[in-house]
Amino acid sequence: GLGSSGSFGVGILHAIYPNATPEFLAKEATRIQMDILNNPIGVQDQYAAAYGGINVYEVNKNGEVKISPLKSYAEWLRLIDVLEQRLVLFFTGLKREANEVLKTQKENAEQMEETLHNTQKLCYNIKNALDEGEFRKFGELMNEHWQYKKQRSPIMTNPQIDEWYELALKNGAVGGKLVGAGGGGFLLFYTEDRERLIKAMPLQHLPFKFDYEGSKVLLNGPHL
């Protein structure tokens, strides 16, 4: 649920092609996963790994991706200072195959299309909230997104996940969601009472930081 397969693919390609552009890395990693491995995935994980930062990705019908950075580097530093304090990630301990969840979404195509249209509209509202520094609204929109996401698949959530989600809302979370395909993995919450939420949740807390640069090659030795 943390984009590990996309990050792994981008990292391997960057090791093979150390001078490659982020665009090449993202496109090639996506092509390998979709066309060669036949995984029913999107493009966001590969592009996030290649480019870094917080971006809006607009995917055209022909597969071309337009990338719009949310902030300049100076603005980015101010943004992540808030988000890294107010976004809290927990591991549910529940594991699932992302392909299994994504397959059920494809089988429910009509419902899936409707929720994706709603999610697309929500994306621009989220962008505006972050641009304007309306962080609480951002948290509320996370909750709205989770309500749409649950409609995509009958195995997106389960009673245990729903119980943890409600517990978080009762202990300072404004909104949240399962990240990734769903069905398990990690829960991400926005809160203005970080310590209260961490103390209340019976799950492993995973600290994290944002990255602005994307995939990098670390040179170690004269022959690289």
How should these model regions be labeled?
Residues L2-P22:
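DPxDG-like acidic metal-binding loop motif
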Residues P18-P22, K27-P40, Q44-K177, L188-L224:
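C-terminal nucleotide
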Residues G1-L2, Q151:
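A generic structural signal for short coil/turn motifs at secondary-structure boundaries
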Residues G185:
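Conserved glycine-rich beta-strand-loop-beta hairpin in the small C-terminal domain of fold type I
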